[in-house]
Amino acid sequence: MREMKKIFAGILMTVLLTGCSSQEILSEVPQTIVLPEEQIDSLPTQEEDPTSAETENTESFSLLEEGGSRFAYESLEAPEQIWYLEIEQALGEMEGTVKLSTDPLEQGLDEQDIDKIFQCVMIDHPEIFYATGYTYTKYSRGEKTVGIDFAGSYELTEEEAIVRAEQIRKITADWIRGIGEDKSEYEKVKAVYEQIIFATDYDLNAPDNQNICSVFLEGASVCQGYAKATQYLLNHLGVMCTLVQGTVDTGEAHAWNLVRVDGDYYYVDTTWGDASYRMEDGSEQEGLSEINYDYLCVTTEDILRTHRIEGVVAMPECTAMEANYYVREGNYFTEYNREQLQRIFDAAREMGRTDITLKCADETCYREICRVLIDEQEIFSYIPDSNSTISYAQNGKQLSLTFWVTNE
């Protein structure tokens, strides 16, 4: 037993519950201009606006891409959807000031609703990477709002945005070909999760880290960049995916995704799937996979152990387990099962892997497997090389265990 204890190198990695800082989530404060009543009557209507004819004669373009999910749009009431479509078009075409329809005003909307609707447009459209916020002008007659002008704020010119959009399309087209459009929805989600983690470094100082440019053009980002890139790729692969905003239990702002696989909803957190990002000291461990699958297609119950869902769009209750990574890959345990565990180690060996991860259904199962494999060191019965050093990591909140062989 003493010899065995010497070669059993246990590394308990502290799971860092960190997310993006609160300043990393897009939150723009608009400007409000209320004109006095005497100026209202002299303002041109949409029909009289002299810029309307110029706009019609100018060749239009749009950076909006087809095929994406409109999950946030579908959460809105009918009057809100009217403004959504107008703001969506304005941002997609990088227009200047546009007049919002007055019908929603008659139905009870006001300038305070613009922020929610703007956020919904941004949630649904990761390809609007060049917009940083908006301003609006409110026209009032007495206490009544009679008109609102909306203008997007952009950090790029039209020409710059078009060039970047084309660069992103070319790069992601190669990624999509590599993934394969004929795969199942689960396989697409898993492949995107892995591709983004392999191709991206977590870097708080990465340029454009609030949008997809950081991932696809720079290879470095933070949580919102990871999440929007995940959404962009899955939308192009025909998988419903939307952005989720909230916090982690340290209180820091964070962003991740909601996906639909075979008709059921699941949460996916690509940022937290980056194992190196989750390390306490940011260092890599020999033999440990770069990918942590604890956050690939998880339930609401699972995600709420570490995340808090906020934002303007209500999320569905996710209860399905069929597309959970551990269930799908056969690494989900309801009790200690020697035959199942042996199959997992044998399969890993055949693929040339030196690590395995398993997930437990509940605390009872988790404690039992920890006792047998770690306390009683039964883990060595699955490793043929008696000279191996085995390291392990525990995620008590997600009830998962990772074991890997090192040469130390």
List the model feature ranges, each with a label:
Residues V146-F150, S214, E218, D264-T270:
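Short, well-ordered strand-loop elements centered on a beta-strand within folded domains, enriched
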Residues I212-Y226:
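A short, highly charged nucleic-acid-interacting micro-segment common to nuclease
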Residues R2-I25:
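Sec-dependent N-terminal signal peptides of Gram-positive bacterial secreted proteins and lipoproteins
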Residues G225-V298:
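Hydrophobic/aromatic-rich core segments of domains that either
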Residues G19-D182, T299-E408:
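N-terminal accessory/pre-domain segments preceding catalytic cores
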Residues L85-I87, E159, L217-S221, Q245:
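Alpha-helix capping and helix-loop boundary segments enriched in small/acidic/polar residues
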Residues E160-V215:
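Secondary-structure boundary elements
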